[in-house]
Amino acid sequence: MKAVIAVFITLMLTAVVAFQPAASFSAPKCAGKMSMAIEDAPKKAAAAALAALTTLSVISPSFAITKEELRSLDYLQVKGTGLANRCPEVKGTDSIKVKGAGQEIVDLCIEPKTFQVLEETRNKKGELSKEFINTKLMTRQTYTLDGISGDLNVVDGKIQFTELDGIDYAATTVQKPGGERVPFLFTVKELVAKASAGGNTIAPGFQMGGKFVVPSYRTGLFLDPKGRGATTGYDMAVALPGIQSGVEGDEELFRENNKVFDVLSGQIEFEVNRVNLEEGEIGGVFVSTQGSDTDMGSKSPETVLLKGIFYGRIADKE
């Protein structure tokens, strides 16, 4: 009886922490220390961030919850606790050998812990520089990707994961220190992640990464406040034709009136730090960079940097 009570108390404490997954990581009043040109060196930036994440403990072990513990809970025990937005912890430092084919990663869960946006700032000398600034998360408990699956193969002597299915996108909004909000579609659609080194073994320290597709935040049927859309709605707002006189201002109005379904790209890097051979589980940290919402072509996308944890399970195909 005492053991059951202890487990229940641990789960309740986990639920309390789950409601504040990014609070201690995204203080809006201070700028991040990471300053880089992410377009020129995404892999170098991701490697540095991965090293920092690996050094620090992203989740306190006392509040971590395993997949087995999650499975033991029913719907009412999970409802309203935030646990559904959490990735499980993996216990163990084993290693798993990947077959050449016939295997897949299932139940892949990707949970961001920090959200930063690339911003142009001016220092005391008046010099302009770009650096990632911390933001405040405005989205509640619906920003974690879960249930993702895909093929796991060995291609050209390196392990490769190809994403195929699952809840692989989540509409998310963050707020900059000045109050400006940045919506973006957190995703790993069509991800092809390759190992950084050769071999067929996944063990602590294993790294892989690759590019993915970032669809438009809005679909073609979306209408803006003036009733304009990509596939339906008005062609332009009332009284705007008179402003479009063939001189300055036409380009801005054209982008506002002509909605497009922008498809961008992103880059993600994973590093494994826990492996459970018996359950086939792997866990670790990730760093991802991608573009933000373009308001269907009327705005330039901002660069968003996300860092957090992931969980996955290696299984044979049925």
UniProtKB/Swiss-Prot annotation:
Where mainly located? plastid
Q: Which GO terms describe its biological process?
A: photosystem II assembly; photosystem II stabilization
Q: Does the keyword Zinc apply?
A: no
Which portions of this protein are annotated as coiled-coil regions? Answer: none
Q: Which Gene3D superfamilies match?
A: photosynthetic oxygen evolving center domain (3.30.2050.10), Photosystem II, cytochrome c-550 precursor (2.40.160.30)
Q: Where is the signal peptide?
A: 1-18
Keyword line:
Chloroplast, Membrane, Photosynthesis, Photosystem II, Plastid, Signal, Thylakoid, Transmembrane, Transmembrane helix
Summarize induction of expression. Expression shows a diurnal pattern of oscillation across the 24-hour light-dark, with increased levels during the light period (at protein level). Down-regulated in the late stationary growth phase as compared to the early stationary and exponential growth phases.
Transmembrane ranges, per UniProt, are 45-65
State its location(s): Plastid, Chloroplast thylakoid membrane
Q: Name one GO cellular component term.
A: photosystem II
Q: How does it sit in the membrane?
A: Single-pass membrane protein
Q: Which Pfam families does the record match to this protein?
A: MSP
**UniProt record similarity statement:** Belongs to the PsbO family.
The record's function comment reads: Stabilizes the manganese cluster which is the primary site of water splitting.
Q: What is this protein called?
A: Oxygen-evolving enhancer protein 1, chloroplastic
Q: Which organism is it from?
A: Chattonella marina var. antiqua (Red tide flagellate)
